[in-house]
């Protein structure tokens, strides 16, 4: 049985201070075989690589637009530096010249925590409390899908049968609970210092909860959480968000990030303050801040 995972499944942003080439650098994807194709939404041209699009040659106020679908995110993790925080930090540091336009965060359940049949029934029976005005349940040959929020909403929750959509007969269970955020909601999400898993559930808990209706209490917001939903929420303290790739793949990503993404800043720092000052500050940081778990794992595997 596969482990449950949480992942970024759509990343889209614009920049008025970048060219298409500097966006490639930002992603760590300068050396991959991009294809030049027709742009969209007012952009005349677009660089395309494995579901990653960089649109350019629009009007001056449009800047450039980078869009990574779910498959594009996987390509970024495989062929680029894979450091989403590097992208998000850049957007946070340049709020007047960049915009986070869309961000999807998905929880993939392979272990049966998300009971889609119960979720669909409770939705139809209005056994939930929500900040959304609209909801929808769809049944099709691609499986069951439950929506909270409209397609134009700044935030939307979609729970659906990924196993049926992908026709994965080799899996017993694959249900995805996806939070789609746009514009200000997406920007607020990336500004949080919480780990990704805690951020995800903090947003989900704020917008949606399935309940056990109490006929003796007319205030449904006080109702207990439905058992099937509580089982899903209880995973917040136990699930690791890091999926362990191969060591050499990690070394490549580490080098790609340090040299391609942060190389200019490091080089400037050394020229201004010297290599000894840089090493001193890094040693001080090591004593004050715990290393990211993926870097700790890399050090352990390299001996």
What are these regions (language model features)?
Residues 1-249, 257-303:
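Structured, helix-rich domain cores that form ligand/interaction pockets
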